[in-house]
Curated annotation (Swiss-Prot):
Residues 143-453 form the NB-ARC domain. It comes from Arabidopsis thaliana. The lineage of its organism: Eukaryota, Viridiplantae, Streptophyta, Embryophyta, Tracheophyta. Potential disease resistance protein. Belongs to the disease resistance NB-LRR family. RPP13 subfamily. The gene is RPP13L3. ATP binds at residues 192-199. It comes from the Eukaryota. Residues 24-41 form a coiled coil. It holds the Pfam family WH_DRP. GO terms for biological process: defense response; response to other organism. Signal peptide: none annotated. This is Putative disease resistance RPP13-like protein 3. GO terms for molecular function: ADP binding; ATP binding.
């Protein structure tokens, strides 16, 4: 397991060896020797795991390795931090800088030679302890080979493997949909041990077409062991999907739970609703929720999932408690073979016999079976016996526990994949994780190495897909064939947390205890009080500080906590900064965090960035989403490493060349016109936001050609009220020479369509998602899509909420849009006449 850390440090040493400063100081050779020794030790660690050595001697040796790996990282990072700090100083400090540089150079030479002596001592101890030999692999980088294999793999399957729950689904659907007045079951509780499939069953019911049609509105929330009633209520309100984003921001400011209860009660009163409350551990959680849910016997239902029978049967007098059973062997085998044999062309009797022996020992627990099958699906057939033998050595009570299967799966991961999985321990229990954010964090942490053929973000996505394929992570939401959000089962999360603690990988803040001095990351899930962040012991070796959770009123962050100089990741989403009594300004001290790669200030009300932001030349991601628009000039031109800029920059936004830029959401048309579009070759996600409230004097004529110059552009959103779209290039937005070879999603908001734009748009070769929101059809009465048009389009959404010229008719020819699965026409367009093929009528939604 420690190999995850040593592998990471080896990659970091490799990056520093490229720096010519080390060669000038005469320390490069020493660092090369250090790397060679650590590479050998990295291999010995794999040997310790392979031989399943768990004796005290091996544990002590691996602890020594972990300590020195972290010390190597600290020495290198601290030295280069000082170099960067000195490079920012000018004028009278020049002489002091020269003296300081000489002192720093002397110190790092001594530090590296001390580390070299320590690592040689560790090597001698290995021989004394009798830890086995290691043959370093030759040839092409294993990680690169595996990443390319993943790239060629089929896309993630959206269909969840649900076996043995068919009867449960039928029984509970009857309960949910029944009109029988004698059936007073307002609450349905599903209970059973962890890993049986309670959430999977509830999700199956929640997504049922019959259920969607029966209820006016639905909501899903989770509770978990550490819960706050406030967070649960906010999640229910958001999940209902009937409250605007602006209203949600106001709701988050409610100070008392009672205010939220009254608000939710008002939303649901008179409606036929369904609410799923997942993973309840404490009966008080339901008691605090039920006051907010009207029980007027209009057919509304609440589904509760829990491991505890007393909660399932005792929540209410009208409860129907449904106990989940273990799978039969036949069901277990069906679940297993669907995944385990998916990559095997021919399954012989010996392989079946070996598989059945292992499945029997899983005792009918679905989670253990899917993790085991995920492990074996990646093994060659001759390796199955090795897995079986290893399982037999680890049997507990003559059965395979989920922890046993997980240990085997984790053990054989490459170190990069181990780090990615351990990062799931950062997130709260039952938390829905946005994959885009997770990818940005993994890259910023330095866990991802660039492949010859792929960008780091694509490599990170491959790792997440592999964890999904191994059944260690659940794909929650999928769009355009990509996992957009995911979740980890709480049992697997517990195992990830256990391993993360052993490695000092992360500490989840607890006001009763402090993390160790070498812990690399600290994460806060709940604020105990608003000012707790102001008065805390600072761990100067920390690389990441994250607040992840629901915003609870106002959480203040004192600027003294922003002086952790080695930070690579700072995520303060949902908190407020205290900076000279101005809460919408990021403190100047942020410019001292020159190692920073990720700055998350979403939902913080920050709308002004200080000039010191220019010091963050290694910054890769700036996430200011959910904040008020940045009205003043924002200068990011010196941030040459920027890959992702997220926020509403309505004033002038200076980007520089932007050669590394992949995400730009969102800037004004004026700022876009100032960029050199030819240099934006890596840009994949672009949003232009022009609104009369902010940019009357800054609006400039645009042409679709400017958007087509970044050839890798996949997502384009234009929110430009009252702008016109036609085939003429002299208009504000023209469709002349449209050429988007990679575009997958196009959203137009507030655009005036002067003519039928579909003939031009339907030629986009990879377009899967087209949204026309609040568009004005002033020059169009009939919009038509011809045969063969939109060959890959899966979703077409047309809506109009404000007053304007609507559309009389939408015509779709017989062979058009062969891939379509969703056609939405809503708002003032509900009266639009649809002339469409019969095959598409099942996909139409008018709401």
């Amino acid at each position: 397991m420690v190999d995850a850390v040593t592998g990471f440090v080896l990659n970091k040493i490799g990056g520093y060896l490229i720096n010519e400063v080390l060669a000038l100081m005469g320390v490069k050779d020493d660092l090369e020797e250090l790397k060679t020794e650590l590479t050998c030790i990295h291999g010995y660690l794999k040997d310790v795991e392979a031989r399943e050595r768990e004796d005290e001697v091996s544990k002590e040796w691996t602890k020594l390795v972990l300590d020195i790996a972290y010390d190597i990282e600290d020495v290198l990072d601290t030295y280069f931090l000082k170099l960067e700090e000195r490079s920012l100083r000018r004028g009278l400090l020049r002489l002091t800088n020269k003296i300081g540089k000489k002192r720093d150079a002397y110190n790092i030479v001594e530090d590296i030679r001390t580390l070299k002596r320590r690592i040689l001592d560790i090597t001698r101890k290995r021989e004394t302890f009798g830890i086995g030999s290691f043959n370093e692999p030759r040839g092409e980088n294993i990680t690169n080979v595996r990443v390319r294999q993943l790239r060629r793999a089929p896309p993630v399957d959206q269909e969840e493997l649900v076996v043995g729950l068919e009867d449960d689904v039928k029984i509970l659907l009857v309960k949910l949909l029944s009109d029988n007045e004698k059936d007073k079951s307002y609450i349905i509780s599903i209970f059973g041990m962890g890993g049986l499939g309670k959430t999977a069953l509830a999700r199956k019911l929640y997504n049922s077409g019959d259920v969607k049609r029966r209820f006016d509105c639905r909501a899903w929330t989770y509770v978990s062991q550490e819960y706050k009633t406030r967070d649960i209520l906010i999640r229910i309100i958001r999940s209902l999907g009937i409250v605007s984003a602006e209203e949600m921001e106001k709701i988050k400011m409610f100070e008392e739970d009672e205010e939220l209860e009254v608000y939710l009660y008002g939303l649901l009163e008179g409606k036929n609703y369904m609410v799923v409350v997942d993973d309840v551990w404490d009966p008080d959680a339901w008691e605090s929720l039920k006051r907010a849910l009207p029980c007027d016997h209009r057919g509304s239902k609440v589904i509760i999932t829990t491991r505890i029978r007393a909660i399932a049967e005792g929540v209410e007098g009208t409860v129907y408690a449904h106990k989940l059973r273990f799978l039969t062997f036949e069901e277990s085998w069906t679940l297993f073979e669907r995944k385990a044999f998916s990559n095997i062309e021919k399954v012989d009797e010996d392989l079946q016999r070996t598989g059945k022996e292992m499945v029997k020992k899983c005792g009918g627990l679905p989670l253990a079976i899917v993790v085991l099958s995920g492990l074996l699906s990646r093994k060659r057939t001759n390796e199955w016996h090795e897995v079986c033998a290893s399982l037999w050595r680890r049997l507990k009570d003559n059965s395979i526990h989920i922890s046993t299967v997980f240990d085997l799966s984790f053990k054989e991961m490459r170190h990069e994949l181990k780090l990615c999985f351990l990062y799931f321990s950062v997130f709260p229990e039952d938390y829905e994780i946005k994959v885009e954010k997770l990818i940005h964090l993994l890259v910023a942490e330095g866990f991802i190495q660039e492949d010859e053929e792929m960008m780091m973000e694509d490599v990170a996505r491959c790792y997440i897909d592999e964890l999904v394929d191994r059944s260690l992570v659940k794909a929650e939401r999928i769009e355009r064939g990509k996992v957009m959000s995911c979740r980890i089962h709480d049992l697997l999360r517990d195992l990830a947390i256990k391993k993360a603690k052993e490695l000092n990988f992360v500490n989840v803040y607890n006001e009763k205890q402090h993390s160790s001095d070498i812990c690399r990351r600290e994460v806060v899930h709940h604020l105990m009080n608003d000012y707790y962040l102001c008065d805390r012991r600072v761990n100067k070796r920390m690389r990441s500080f994250l607040f992840i959770g629901e915003r609870r009123g106002f959480g203040y962050v004192n600027t003294t906590n922003l002086k952790l100089k080695l930070l690579r990741v700072l995520n303060m989403e949902g908190l407020l900064f205290v900076s000279k009594n101005i809460s919408n300004t990021l403190p100047d001290v942020i410019g001292e965090l020159i190692h920073l790669r990720y700055l998350g200030i979403a939902d913080t009300y920050v709308s002004i960035l200080p000039a010191s932001i220019s010091n963050l030349r290694f910054l890769q991601t700036l996430d200011a989403s959910g904040n008020d628009p940045f009205q003043y000039t924002t200068d990011l031109s010196k941030l040459t490493s920027l890959r992702h800029v997220i926020g509403k920059f309505v004033g002038e936004c200076l980007i520089g060349e932007g050669v590394n830029l992949q995400t730009l959401r969102s800037i004004s048309s004026y700022s876009w016109s100032k960029l050199n579009h030819e240099l934006l070759r890596n840009l994949q996600d672009l949003e232009i936001y022009d609104h009369s409230k902010w940019v009357d004097q800054r609006r400039v004529p645009l042409n679709f050609v400017s958007f087509s110059k970044p050839k890798n552009l996949r997502v384009l959103k234009l929110e430009m009220r009252n702008f016109k779209l036609s085939s003429e290039s002299r208009t504000t937005i023209g469709l002349v020479d449209v050429n988007f070879p990679s575009l997958e999603s196009l959203t137009l908001v507030g655009t005036t369509l002067e003519e039928n734009s579909m003939p031009a748009l339907q030629k986009l070769p990879r377009l899967e998602d087209l949204v026309l929101k609040d568009c004005n059809y002033s020059g169009v009465k009939i919009m038509s899509i011809s045969a063969q048009g939109f060959g890959r389009l899966k979703n077409l959404e047309m809506s109009m909420e404000r007053r304007g010229h609507g559309l009389d008719e939408l015509r779709i020819e017989e062979e058009a849009m062969p891939s379509l699965i969703k056609l939405t026409v809503k708002g003032r367009l509900e009266l639009t006449k649809l002339m469409i093929p019969d095959r598409l009528k099942a996909f139409v939604r008018r709401n």
